[in-house]
A protein has these predicted regions:
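Right-handed parallel beta-helix/beta-solenoid
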Residues: 24-59, 76
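Glycine-rich repeat segments that build the extracellular carbohydrate-interaction surface of secreted
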Residues: 35-39, 60-78, 93-99
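Beta-solenoid repeat scaffold
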Residues: 69, 80-114, 126-130
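Feature marking well-ordered beta-strand scaffolds used for ligand recognition
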Residues: 108-557
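Short boundary segments that mark the start of a structured unit
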Residues: 551-785
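Solvent-exposed loop segments of extracellular immunoglobulin-like
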Residues: 814-821
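Surface-exposed, flexible coil segments in extracellular/virion-facing regions
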Residues: 821-842
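A cross-kingdom C-terminal cell-surface attachment/processing module
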Residues: 892-912
Length: 950
């Protein structure tokens, strides 16, 4: 029987749930929230409810979310194994003891929690965390001490950076591995902003230079890292942001005909702060990046995805501009929102999903087979399908018409705990789905489910893969017949998906060697789409790893092009050679497809197709690319051709993308500098890259000599690099070449120095432009870098209260003093106590309903460079939640209604509103509204509710 008050809550709930929306706080259950442990507790659920804590430290560690804090009440607790001891002493998960427990509440740290099973050498460290250590024999004896000390030492080493190491005998240095080499570790100490944790990673190949870049999210911003030499990564720049545990990144690259060059933008969403969507202009690469002034219409979102893009370069796959698919924003229920990139610097909202279902992550497929006509609603020459992973189901949408998305199907599955993300196979017939909570909720080993999408309107589960540990699978991406998974505590996992329904483990690199449990630690993201074959991995706890996958070395052979570039005149054909190397076992095949760069579909007649080899045949195959003579003088145009979907067990080698350059008939070849003036500094990137480009024609051989012919910088003292030599292009090679100079930091204050490089003795080509380039080198203080504005996290406060805006965390990379300017952007006008101080305050206005105010902080350095950041303050009619901006949308809920709902949901869910049994409730009700506020404290106070057991 349901008690009367609970029944009333159910009735109120039924009538008011439309005001409540599930937001990104539900997206990673337990992430960034305190966990509670107390003697007499029960090890079940996620330890999020202080009224119903867990019993053991080990259990709490196993379910801790990203950025979690574990609060331990007074009492005695055993540290059962070296892994738990490591997590306590290393600080990778914040653990605090000594909380006084009064009734069902954890009060401030006033007492002592006693730990047993801990060696005495950790006593002083743990004392500062509120613990008393009892050094019993169990804690002193055996391999436990040695193992814990080894883990602590390894953690310190990893923070400083791990050396490159091939995978030999199951080890790559200190990491367990299988067929994956460690090329480089770009640790937190290598990042100029000194972050403490990493989030997601994406990447792209800059078509101006063919240099490769990883874009890495961190807790305090986003870095662009040059990984062209994967053994020596270098940070190009860092864009500061508000502190947050979640950042997601995608890229769009396009050719600007007015400037005759490629331009690229990175799009960064942040959850847990009010940064909204950052747009980073990367068109200044290889030397600089900058954040644009774009202001998004949302202030928080969990994920971003760029539809209709090639994952290696970020260029559009069709003649339509890509859409940004925003997942889990603070607007409405966090459902899909589409933004056109018609103006890449200013994404503009087009339309969103018609349903109110929170979308956590997304992927998309361009369908060109018969399904586009029989199964899509809006298809024309193609159908663009969006895969919507929305916590409870996998939804498939037709977004071919961006302004009118149509849902084609909704697919649940057994043991669904949290439908998180997924990717598609290159035959476009299967998707691989990640559930982020099934390992915890159902005690499963790592599980990836495989669905057939032969019928887009009725996907069917056809298989699954289970790992050897319970580590959580996070995200995955397909390249050929390899599936690369960021496997949290297990690091990088590589699957062979030759048979998509039966994936097989073929590679791994354990970037988190401390445990393989179900905690949210270790590898967050991975990116396997670089032309070079480098695979990037972002690890929450230790930063960026660059790896090489050797699982592609198989007896069936590897497919690759025999050159990175080919060329032909309009009206003729280009012949491309595809090789099978490393083995010839079995019957195999590989597909190929065109990706338009500057050569549009009307410039060639290449159709996608398949090449086949019988067993024992290792001969070459040819792809004929007819080039159309359109009669227009267009300059040298570029087409990309990609090998895809290998079958029979053969794999894609590193060179699976090539360029075909289309010459105007009779055009003459020229060689010149991409930019004739570049600027760099002795610090920071400390590298000068001069890009040489070939234009006009790429059909014959060409070469040119270069030499340092002037400038005030001295070779060997001020810079290192070749001071003279010859750069050559083979026949058909139209790809850019790079001259690289490493700049030395001499220290002290000196004038700007220069390097002058001249071109001469061109063979097979003329010299374009002046044939001279100048590098300007700023002294040890570096080029003046724009400051970083940090306006603080969003706040929720009650009306008529004092609100403090704190911008004191703003900083200048050059150490310059800053000036401050606070401005109110939106909302009822208030009076700021100061507009020119780092910290200002105001009194929240009287409001009739919950109202959001937005403020902008602009900081400027003495040279005039500036940066801006915004923050929000939501003013409520009642008591403020003080949640610091959890990313939830505005709500107008009577306090007593919210109070009753919180209380009832906690009772129904066994003191945990996030238990899987009650997903039907939490799909409509935001459990995060019940935490960290007066509502929570009252809802947990039994004296206010005489509710008997139901």
């Amino acid at each position: 029987m349901i008690p009367l008050l609970r029944l009333a809550a159910l009735t109120i709930f039924a009538g008011t749930f439309t005001f409540l929306s599930p937001q990104s706080a539900e997206a990673h259950r337990g992430a960034g929230e305190p966990l509670f442990v107390a003697a007499g507790g029960v090890d079940q659920g996620r330890c999020l409810d202080e009224a119903s804590p867990c019993r053991s430290l080990g259990y709490a560690l196993s379910v801790a979310g990203k950025g979690a804090e574990i609060r331990i009440a007074e009492g005695t607790y055993e540290v059962g194994n070296p892994e738990d001891l490591f997590h306590v002493v290393s600080g990778m998960i914040q653990v605090s003891g000594g909380f006084e427990r009064r009734g069902k509440r954890f009060l401030e740290r006033r007492g002592i929690s006693t730990l047993t099973g801990v060696p005495p050498q950790f006593r002083e460290l743990l004392k500062g965390k509120g613990f008393n250590v009892v050094s019993d024999r169990k804690g002193i004896d055996g391999p436990k001490v040695a193992e814990a000390e080894k883990l602590v030492a390894l953690h310190s080493q990893m923070k400083a950076g791990m050396p490159a190491s091939p995978c030999t005998g199951g080890k790559a240095g200190e990491f367990d591995c299988q067929a994956v080499d460690l090329l480089a570790h770009f640790s937190f100490t290598d990042v100029s902003a000194s972050p403490e944790s990493a989030t997601d990673v994406w990447g792209f190949v800059d078509l101006n230079s063919r240099r490769e870049y990883a874009i890495v999210g961190y807790d305090i911003g986003t870095a662009v890292v040059d990984v062209t030499d994967p053994e020596n990564p270098l940070e190009v720049g860092f864009i500061d942001g508000q502190p947050a545990f979640w950042r997601d990144i995608k890229v769009y690259q396009f050719f600007d005909t007015n400037d005759d060059r490629w331009k690229a933008y990175a799009y960064v969403t942040t959850d847990g702060s009010t940064d909204g969507l950052f747009v980073i202009d990367m068109s200044g690469l290889p030397h600089a990046i900058q954040k644009t002034t774009y202001v998004s219409d949302f202030f928080a979102a969990h994920n971003v995805y760029a539809t209709n893009t090639d994952y290696s370069t970020g260029i559009a796959l069709t003649n339509e501009p890509p859409l940004l698919a925003i997942s889990g924003s603070n607007i409405s229920s966090g459902q899909y929102r589409g933004y056109t990139l018609q103006d890449p610097a200013a994404p503009a909202f087009v339309a969103g999903a018609s349903s109110a279902d929170y979308m956590h992550d997304a992927s998309s497929i361009i369908i060109t087979d018969a399904r586009k006509d029989s199964q899509c609603d809006n298809a024309a020459a193609w159908c663009e399908v969006l895969l919507d992973f929305n916590e409870l189901t996998i939804d498939v949408w037709d977004i071919t018409n961006p302004s009118s998305p149509a849902r084609l199907s909704r697919t649940p599955y057994a043991n669904a705990a949290y439908v998180h993300s997924g990717w598609w196979s290159e035959d476009k017939q299967h998707i691989f789905v990640h559930d982020e909570q099934d390992e915890q909720d159902f005690s499963l080993n790592t599980t990836v489910r495989v669905f057939s999408v032969a019928d887009l309107r009725a996907p069917v589960m056809v298989g699954e893969w289970s790992g050897t540990t319970r580590a959580i699978d996070h995200n995955g991406f397909v390249r050929g017949n390899r599936y690369y998974i960021s496997n949290y505590a297990k690091g990088l996992t590589v699957l062979d998906i030759t048979d998509p329904a039966e994936p097989v483990t073929v590679g791994s690199l354990d970037t988190y060697p401390f445990s393989d449990n179900t905690a949210f630690v270790g590898a967050w993201g991975t990116y396997p789409f670089f032309f070079s074959g480098t695979v990037a991995v972002s690890d929450i706890d230790t930063g960026l790893y660059l790896t090489r996958d050797r699982s592609i070395e198989v007896p069936q052979g590897r497919f690759s092009f025999d050159a990175a570039s080919y060329a032909g005149d309009e009206g003729q054909s280009a012949l491309i050679t595809v090789r099978r190397t490393g083995g010839s076992s079995g019957n195999v095949s590989v597909g190929f497809e065109a990706v338009a760069a500057t050569a549009a579909n009307g410039d060639h007649q290449l159709q996608s197709g398949t090449l086949e080899w019988p067993a024992g045949d290792a001969g070459d195959r040819l792809i004929n690319v007819p080039l159309v003579n359109d009669g227009n003088a267009e300059g040298l145009e570029q087409l990309l051709v990609r090998l895809v979907n290998p079958t029979g067990g053969a794999t894609l080698d590193q060179l699976n993308v090539t360029s075909v350059y289309v010459n105007d008939p009779g055009a003459l070849a020229e060689v010149g500098f991409f930019e004739e003036s570049v600027a760099t500094a002795e610090r920071g990137f400390a590298t000068a890259v001069l890009v040489l480009q070939r234009s006009g024609s790429a059909t014959g051989e060409a070469s040119i000599d270069f030499a340092v012919t002037g400038g005030s910088a001295s070779p060997g003292t001020d810079f290192d690099g070749e001071t003279s030599g010859t750069v050559a292009w083979a026949a058909g090679d139209g790809n850019p070449k790079n001259l690289v100079f490493n700049i030395a930091d001499e220290g002290g204050d000196e004038d700007t120095e220069t390097i002058e490089v001249s071109l001469s003795n061109a063979l097979g080509a003329g010299i374009r432009g002046a044939g001279t380039a100048t590098v300007e080198i700023a002294n040890g203080s570096g080029l003046n870098t724009a400051p970083n504005a940090i306006a603080g996290s969003g706040q929720t406060v009650a009306q008529n209260n004092v609100v403090v805006l704190n911008g004191s965390q703003s900083n200048d990379p050059d150490g310059d003093s800053l000036t401050y300017l606070w401005e109110q952007v939106s909302g009822p006008q208030v009076g700021l106590s100061s507009t020119s101080s780092p910290v200002t305050e105001f009194t929240s206005p009287t409001v009739s309903s919950d109202t959001m105010l937005q403020f902008r902080l602009t900081v400027s350095d003495p040279s005039g460079l500036s940066d801006s950041a915004t923050t929000t303050v939501t003013v409520t009619t009642g008591a403020g939640s003080g949640d610091g901006g959890s990313g939830g949308g505005s709500t107008s809920i009577p306090f007593i209604v919210l109070l009753v709902l919180c209380r009832s949901l906690r009772r129904l869910a066994g003191h945990d509103t996030r238990e899987p049994l009650h997903k039907s409730w939490t799909a409509y009700f935001r459990p995060d509204l019940c935490r960290g506020s007066l509502v929570e404290r009252m809802a947990l106070d039994d004296r206010l509710f005489a509710i008997g057991p139901g």
